[in-house]
Regions:
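Flexible "stalk/tail and boundary" regions
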Residues: 1-24, 28-29, 37-106, 114-170
Length: 170
């Protein structure tokens, strides 16, 4: 409670979840220890998560309930999937490159070997960048993250230039 004016009022504080960048290591068995901040974000939604390989070459980690909401929004009926190459391909990609995982008591998740290879993590211990994406986190190699960050900055600059040109030349 805070004293505001002449009354006590309860202040609602919105905490940003899954925001920021962190760095961690993955051991030779594929175990990743989450930072206390991201671990708190995940455990506030339960310890069940879904790992999902992204086309950009990273591994996303979502709370299970978040992943299920994402999938429901892109739901494909069984009939549509059976009669559609694109429908089957979408299900194949989601099915093959997603896996349930549970955060251990030590605050770790384990990446399957195929997911490590997809994201460019070699064998043995690896450094990784953990990027908050507001609905979960993404695990990147430092090299791939730097390239992705550069692409985003170039895109933002190009978009700004287009907006300025449109504004200056109506």
């Amino acid at each position: 409670m805070d004293y505001i004016g002449n009354k006590w009022k309860k202040q609602v504080v919105w905490m940003l979840t899954f925001c920021g960048i962190d760095y961690c290591s993955m051991d030779s068995n594929g175990r990743v220890k989450l930072s206390p901040k991201f671990l708190e974000d995940f455990t506030s939604k339960g310890i069940d998560v879904v790992l999902h390989c992204l086309p950009e070459g990273a591994v996303a980690v979502y709370p299970e309930e978040t992943y299920l909401k994402i999938r429901q929004e892109r739901e494909i009926t069984e009939n549509r999937a059976a009669g559609s190459f694109l429908g089957r391909q979408m299900l194949r990609r989601s099915g093959a490159w997603s896996q349930s995982e549970r955060i251990s008591a030590q605050g770790r998740i384990t990446l399957p070997q195929a997911f490590r290879e997809h994201a460019g993590f070699g064998s043995g211990s690896q450094k990784m960048v953990v990027v908050g994406v507001e609905i979960g986190v993404e695990l990147w190699t430092p090299e791939r993250w730097n390239a992705e960050r550069q692409r985003m900055e170039e895109h933002d600059l190009e978009k700004r230039n287009q907006e300025m040109q449109a504004d200056l030349n109506p």
